[in-house]
């Protein structure tokens, strides 16, 4: 039975396939580039036009900025559907990740050029590149583990820490460089990170074996699965996956205020002045640097949250992926109450009582958002790889990221309402909506779990 989860030729490091760490570092650098660019995107668009100044931006209003941000991030993830489909039908995940990495290197390099045409052209390359890379590298992580290997969830937690290590370093370093030297130096630095990731991937291909190969190849043992119709169990699992995407849309619609409304709130309405001076940045913390807080908490808490759920499951308590995702939405909702408190410091009974709110409320909000994210996001990635039929593995992962993209668009639309509704009303409304939604998912959990037909109940006998 041991061969169910571990094959003799599989090389391991710290209890996981070596290939996991290859993908860990590739995704770390890809996320360094993406989140580094994202940390300064809305700030760049909203910055005033100052000819000849490296800090000159587009001079857009908050509403215009948040609308564009939502649309851009939506398309970044919507392209995961064709990216996953092309991988499933024509080239396989391994080549799709390679192609995506090349396009991302080109896109980020173009962004370093200080010209309007370069900005929009670079974003187009990034949108297409992420569409090829993002769903397929996640599917490859799942492909490292055989059916029934309960290391899969923990493997995705490790992978997720890599994502957020890159996000932390990207937001911190790119944000600081952009604040000191100019926006396009920040964009260029993000491109260097992506180039490093591409080099790591090319070197690490030998550790991935056949994982990510196109199953339609003549010598593929799974070739016949492309023609085999879905059975009832597979159809039910597809249905519950699509239903779970609604959770994803709600979660990211709230969470992605971090790159939109919360980013602008940090820049315009948060007291970022320290009583002491820090090397390189002085005594005022750049607004973009605050986006590294979430990633920092994930690096610190990722293993602990994963271990908590593992122990929780061993005690025989409810630990399905859908339950964890619902709990994640509720925990994230509590984070927005701290943003409500921040907004209330500025506005009390309709009157302005303070010019800016304290930084501590942002930190506490990001803490709860992080715990919620750790309960929902890596679990959702693993959930898709457990339930998706092999012939649609990358397509369904692409659909997951498309749901993330829709959530990003929703985030931009919600954030844009703050110009009329007010920050306090938006933050409080998000908190209430997410709490009610999470409780509703828990209430209908049993029928949803039946549709999975025990996909998460298969346990490995021995992982040693």
Residue positions per predicted region:
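Conserved MFS/SLC helix-loop-helix module at the cytosolic interface between two early adjacent transmembrane helices
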Residues: 79-113
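Hydrophobic core of transmembrane alpha-helices in multi-pass small-molecule transporters
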Residues: 107, 118-133, 348-375
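C-terminal ends and interior cores of transmembrane alpha-helices
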Residues: 99-120, 326-351
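Cytoplasmic membrane-interface "Motif A"-like loop-to-helix N-cap segments
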Residues: 89-101, 311-330
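Short amphipathic helix-loop junctions that connect adjacent transmembrane helices
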Residues: 39-64, 258-287
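Central cavity-lining transmembrane alpha-helices of secondary-active solute carriers
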Residues: 66-87, 292-305
């Amino acid at each position: 039975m041991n061969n169910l989860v571990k094959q003799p030729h599989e090389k391991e490091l710290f209890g996981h396939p070596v290939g996991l760490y290859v993908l860990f570092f590739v995704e770390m650098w890809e996320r360094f580039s993406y989140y580094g660019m994202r940390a300064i995107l809305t700030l760049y668009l909203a910055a005033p036009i100052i000819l000849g100044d490296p800090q000159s931006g587009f001079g857009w209003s908050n509403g215009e900025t948040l609308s564009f941000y939502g649309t851009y991030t939506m398309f970044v993830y919507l392209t995961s559907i064709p990216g996953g489909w092309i991988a499933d039908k024509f080239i396989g995940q391994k080549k799709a990740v390679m192609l995506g990495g090349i396009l991302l290197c080109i896109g980020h390099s173009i962004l370093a050029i200080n010209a309007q045409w370069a900005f929009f052209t670079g974003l187009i390359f990034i949108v297409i590149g992420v569409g090829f890379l993002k769903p397929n590298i996640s599917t490859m992580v799942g492909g490292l583990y055989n059916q029934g290997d309960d290391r899969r969830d923990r493997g995705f937690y490790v992978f997720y820490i890599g994502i957020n290590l890159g996000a932390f370093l990207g937001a911190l370093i790119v944000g600081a460089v952009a604040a000191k030297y100019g926006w396009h130096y920040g964009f260029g630095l993000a491109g260097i990170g992506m180039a490093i990731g591409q080099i790591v991937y090319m070197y690490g291909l030998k550790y991935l074996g056949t994982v990510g190969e196109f199953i339609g190849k003549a010598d593929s043992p799974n070739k016949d699965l492309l023609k085999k119709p879905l059975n009832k169990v597979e159809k039910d699992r597809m249905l519950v996956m699509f239903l779970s995407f609604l959770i994803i849309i709600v979660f990211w619609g709230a969470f992605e205020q971090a790159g939109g409304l919360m980013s602008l709130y940090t820049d315009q309405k948060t007291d970022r002045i320290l009583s002491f001076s820090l090397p390189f940045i002085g005594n005022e913390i750049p607004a973009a640097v605050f986006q590294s807080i979430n990633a920092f908490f994930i690096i610190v808490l990722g293993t602990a949250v994963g271990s908590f759920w593992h122990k929780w499951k061993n005690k025989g308590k409810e630990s399905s992926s859908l339950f964890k995702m619902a709990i994640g939405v509720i925990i994230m909702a509590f984070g927005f109450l701290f943003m409500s408190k921040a907004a209330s410091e500025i506005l009390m009974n309709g009157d302005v009582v303070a010019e800016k709110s304290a930084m501590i409320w942002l930190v506490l909000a990001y803490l709860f958002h992080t715990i919620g994210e750790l309960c929902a996001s890596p679990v959702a990635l693993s959930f898709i790889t457990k339930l998706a039929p092999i012939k649609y593995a990358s397509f369904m992962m692409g659909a997951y990221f498309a749901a993330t993209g829709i959530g990003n668009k929703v985030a931009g639309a919600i954030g844009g309402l703050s110009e009329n509704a007010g920050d306090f009303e938006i933050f409080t409304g998000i908190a209430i909506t997410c709490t009610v939604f999470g409780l509703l998912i828990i209430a209908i959990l049993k029928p949803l779990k039946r549709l999975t037909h025990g996909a998460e109940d298969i346990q490995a006998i021995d992982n040693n």
